[in-house]
Amino acid sequence: MRNIHSIEFYTGSKEELLPGFEKDFPYIASRAELDKYIGGYVPWHWHRTVELFYMESGSIEYDTPGGKILFPAGSGGMINPNVLHMTKAISQREKNIQLLHIFDVSLLAGEHGSRIEQKYIAPVITAPQIEVIPLFPGNAEEERILKLLAASFRLSSDEFGYEIKLREALTEIWLMLFERSRSMREKKGEHNKSNDKIKLMMIYIHEHYREKIS
């Protein structure tokens, strides 16, 4: 797991560049030390991958087109592919550290168009109303997912069968998220999260709203 203190973009885009992301195993694990980012925040960005995260310590605020959500230590969640988002370190008393699984859905679904993709993956990632699936302590079902999520970050890449064990852990978590998202999937979305023009417009507005309009 790499410690990260900054974000990289594809040239001319706000799509995040993911160093170390390989086609033969489309996955990276990161430990984001938010306090070391410039300004203590990760600017607006998006990526084509799933973002599954757990708050190790501190608290952060996620901002998406749908609103803001605060995640304290012990909470976590999933960010759907192609969702524009930014994060900001909130806690002033302890380090703001976030653990992240970043992966392409093919890691779980296998070949594009597979039965697994059609039944369990596509219904979530193609639902425009699902930007974030938040998970908080205090809810029994969500606590079960959080426990599995925290444990998944303790897997070592040096141990025998790591890739298979990791995929198994992520698959179990995904199935629970799939069930958790049922009510969200039944609601109709009103925005198109894959519209790049809207992404760029929102980024421009948020980056320049303090400037005087001439």
Regions found by a protein language model. Name each.
Residues R115-L146:
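Aromatic/histidine-rich interaction motifs
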Residues I28, P123-V124, L148, L155, ...:
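Residues that form generic nucleotide/phosphate-binding pockets
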Residues E61, M86, H208:
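Detector for the N-terminal beta1/A-loop initiation region of ABC nucleotide-binding domains
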Residues L146-A150, M201:
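Short, Lys/Arg-enriched alpha-helical recognition elements, typified by the DNA-recognition helix
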Residues N82-L107, G113-I116:
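Ligand-binding loop in jelly-roll beta-barrel domains
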Residues G39-W46, D63, K88-I90, G110-G113, ...:
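Short histidine-centered beta-strand/loop micro-motifs
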Residues E131-E142, L155-K212:
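Short, Lys/Arg-enriched, Trp-marked, Pro/Gly-tolerant hinge/linker segments that flank
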Residues M1-G76, N82-V83, Q118, Q129:
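Generic protein-terminus/edge-of-domain signal
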